[in-house]
């Protein structure tokens, strides 16, 4: 396929459309039947989407497949967070979240330099077939290892609407919306979509240099999340809350972003690494929101 920058943007958008549209239904399902079933069933959709993407013959096929993948993995973040809210004590919520994101960055790392090395030998279609095999392996582990969930009694549509209303009216939840929409969304867009093309087309990196830059960006994130998860419970013992850490960290994150803008064509892997690493405090919003509600609304 001879894809333009606009086509690549649409493919990324298709993924996020599928992912975002499912968040409310996924949340309701997580509270009802738990992470094991929800993640498992949705990953079957991701498996179908991944195989479909590998076999696609047109841009439309790629786009629809990306939507399926987005829908399929839509429970992969909130599912674990819902489980952690029930399975772990409050003081370990931030650690569990950080270490989950650390594991997620293994996926980001594998999609950079390793993929760049494999592409000339097996092509992108076989790479997606390999991803499908890994998804199937994950499904087996999920159904074998994740604890069962205590089944809730069937709730009416009215009670579900009331629970959603309770969340949307919560002042703390409302205060976190801009961070999720602007900061977290921006970080995801830069890390997963725009850092690579920027280094390739603006900074003048070769494809291998760009992939290597992304590799080290994600390695840094992986290490940062590990350290972050280790020290967070210790920091909380000194009375330093998640919100205070976010307030301290955001200005540093904004300054790092300003440096990328200032250096423009010369902004390479180091500055992108600095920005994404200093934005790690945004990850604290997810467990902070979960802890602001009762366990039965964790999803």
List PLM regions with ranges.
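Juxtamembrane intracellular "pre-TM" segments in multi-pass secondary transporters
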Residues: 147-177
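Cytoplasmic helix-loop-helix junction between adjacent transmembrane helices
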Residues: 59, 65-103
């Amino acid at each position: 396929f001879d894809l333009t920058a606009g086509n690549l943007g649409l493919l990324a958008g298709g993924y996020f459309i599928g992912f975002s549209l499912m968040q409310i239904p996924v949340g309701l399902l997580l509270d009802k039947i738990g992470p094991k079933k929800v993640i498992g069933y949705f990953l079957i959709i991701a498996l179908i989407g991944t195989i479909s993407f590998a076999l696609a013959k047109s841009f439309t096929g790629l786009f629809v497949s990306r939507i399926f993948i987005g829908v399929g993995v839509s429970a992969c973040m909130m599912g674990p967070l819902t489980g952690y809210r029930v399975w772990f004590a409050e003081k370990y919520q931030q650690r569990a979240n950080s270490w989950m994101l650390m594991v997620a960055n293994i996926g980001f790392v594998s999609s950079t330099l390793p993929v760049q090395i494999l592409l000339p030998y097996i092509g992108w279609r076989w790479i997606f077939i390999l991803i499908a095999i890994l998804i199937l392996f994950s499904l087996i582990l999920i159904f074998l290892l994740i604890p069962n969930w205590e089944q809730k009694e069937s709730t009416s549509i009215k009670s579900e609407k009331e629970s959603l209303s309770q969340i949307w009216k919560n002042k703390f939840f409302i205060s976190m919306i801009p961070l999720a929409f602007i900061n977290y969304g921006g970080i995801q867009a830069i890390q997963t979509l725009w850092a690579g093309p920027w280094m390739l087309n603006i900074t003048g990196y070769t494809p291998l240099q760009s992939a290597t830059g992304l590799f080290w960006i994600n390695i840094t994130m992986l290490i940062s999340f590990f350290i972050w998860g280790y020290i967070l419970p210790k920091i909380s013992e000194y009375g330093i809350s998640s919100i205070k850490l976010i307030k301290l960290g955001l200005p540093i994150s904004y300054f790092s972003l300003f440096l990328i803008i200032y250096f423009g064509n010369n902004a390479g892997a180091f500055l992108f690494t600095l920005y994404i690493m200093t934005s790690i405090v945004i990850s604290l919003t997810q467990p902070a929101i979960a802890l602001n509600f009762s366990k039965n609304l964790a999803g």
